């Protein structure tokens, strides 16, 4: 079993509530089959809770009730599966092009009994027209100049991109400003999430989008 500190447990209880056991089972999947099959590096196991699961799960506070969320480049389910566990009111579409990752994701979804998750084996740019999300999430996919073009077209006429980023978030916004505006972004900001829960809060780039017409 993956160790969890008292502080991590407190944060996990607040985020996952009565679904904490599901979160613990997910972490065990990450630590075992996830590492065996190359979705998570072995060195990450001791910090799965703090650096990965809680880091991702706290962004649930930025997503409105009942939203359809598309998670681009879902990989090991970060943040997609974290959100599906924390927020059963959300409808999650996990978009992942690599077959071995898709197989693993489906195994975890089936084992946890998550009925609010759909997995698509495809690239984000090929999912345009098949997904009309209210919110698109991403973590460690690419720089914002490229990520904007992968995420914004997946939104319905209006919506939000919630991308987990690092300390360079502000610089990325500056470089991507023109691309974001062209795609329909009307407001872009850096938001710090989880300050009261995590030792290292999560940095999020939030893009509010209102498109005049569907971008193909």
Listing of model-derived features with the role each one plays in the protein:
Residues 34-35, 78, 188:
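Residue-level signal for pocket-adjacent positions within structured domains
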Residues 90-216:
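S-adenosylmethionine
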Residues 27-30, 41, 46, 79, ...:
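Short, well-ordered helical secondary-structure segments
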Residues 76-89:
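Conserved SAM-binding loop of SAM-dependent methyltransferases across substrates and taxa
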Residues 72-74:
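Conserved beta-strand/loop positions that form the S-adenosyl-L-methionine
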Residues 13, 37-38, 46-47, 76, ...:
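Flexible, active-site-adjacent loop/turn segments at secondary-structure boundaries
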Residues 1-70, 86, 100-117:
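Class I SAM-dependent transferase core
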């Amino acid at each position: 079993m993956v160790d969890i500190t008292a502080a991590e447990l407190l944060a996990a209880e607040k985020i996952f509530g009565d679904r904490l056991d599901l979160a613990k089972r997910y972490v065990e999947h990450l630590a075992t089959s996830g590492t065996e099959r190359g979705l998570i590096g072995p060195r990450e196991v001791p910090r799965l809770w703090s650096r990965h699961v809680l880091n991702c799960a706290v962004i649930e506070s930025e997503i409105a009730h009942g939203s359809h969320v598309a998670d681009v480049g879902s990989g090991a389910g970060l943040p997609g599966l974290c959100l599906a566990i924390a927020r059963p009111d959300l409808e999650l579409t996990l978009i992942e092009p690599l077959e071995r990752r898709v197989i693993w994701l489906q195994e975890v979804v089936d084992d946890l009994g998550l009925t609010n998750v759909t997995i698509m084996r495809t690239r984000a740019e090929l999912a345009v027209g098949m997904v009309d999300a209210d919110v698109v999430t991403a973590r460690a996919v690419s720089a914002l100049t490229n990520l904007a073009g992968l995420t914004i077209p997946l939104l319905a006429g209006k919506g939000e991109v919630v991308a987990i980023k690092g300390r360079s978030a502000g610089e990325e916004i500056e470089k991507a400003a023109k691309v974001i505006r062209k795609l329909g972004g009307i407001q872009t900001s850096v938001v710090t999430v989880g300050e009261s829960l995590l030792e290292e809060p999560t940095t999020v780039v939030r893009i509010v989008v209102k498109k005049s017409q569907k971008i193909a």
